[in-house]
Amino acid sequence: MTKQQNQAEALSVRQIPFAEAEYEQALKLRDEVLRRPLGMSIADDDLSGDADALHIGAFARSGAGDAHAERLVGTLLLRALDGRTLQMKQVAVEKARRGTGTGRDMVRFAEVRAAELGYGEIVLHARENAVPFYEKLEYIREGERFEEIGIPHYRMRRELG
């Protein structure tokens, strides 16, 4: 699928329920995008915190079909660190959708939802190659580079509101 075809598909972003079909699709996408390229499996991850997280999904649909024709093309989750701060984790967009605004739309949706819930900031650990993406979205890099799951990361933060 080309970027032009991807841009022709309608994109909707919404919160998805834990432990239902959309969550299972999100797990599969997280595995394909974030774990398999590193020779890892999401089955080896500690997913116990997922039950308390806020899950966001981006869904593509071409034409005027019904919701059942939608497919998950991006996902992320937010975990509360305290009453003011959420950590954004597991941001994954299918390869064919990168560069089409899918990631940006998910992050912006997550920020609005976080603010609605009374949170004042989002923090994240960005893979080194994703830092420019987050900087465009006004996230500030903090501290030195560190390794997580064997690859370089930076801590980033954005104040909401």
Label the model's feature ranges.
Residues 123-125, 135, 140-157:
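Conserved catalytic-core motifs of GNAT/GCN5-like acyltransferases
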Residues 57, 66-80, 87-92:
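Conserved beta-strand in the GNAT
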Residues 10-26:
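A short beta-loop-alpha structural element at the N-terminal edge
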Residues 28-67:
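Active-site rim helix/loop that mediates acceptor-substrate recognition in acyltransferases
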Residues 93, 99-112:
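Conserved acetyl-CoA-binding loop-helix of GNAT-fold acetyltransferases
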Residues 80-89, 98, 148-150:
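A conserved beta-turn-beta hairpin within the catalytic core of GNAT-like acetyltransferases
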Residues 107, 114-127:
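Conserved GNAT acetyl-CoA-binding A-motif
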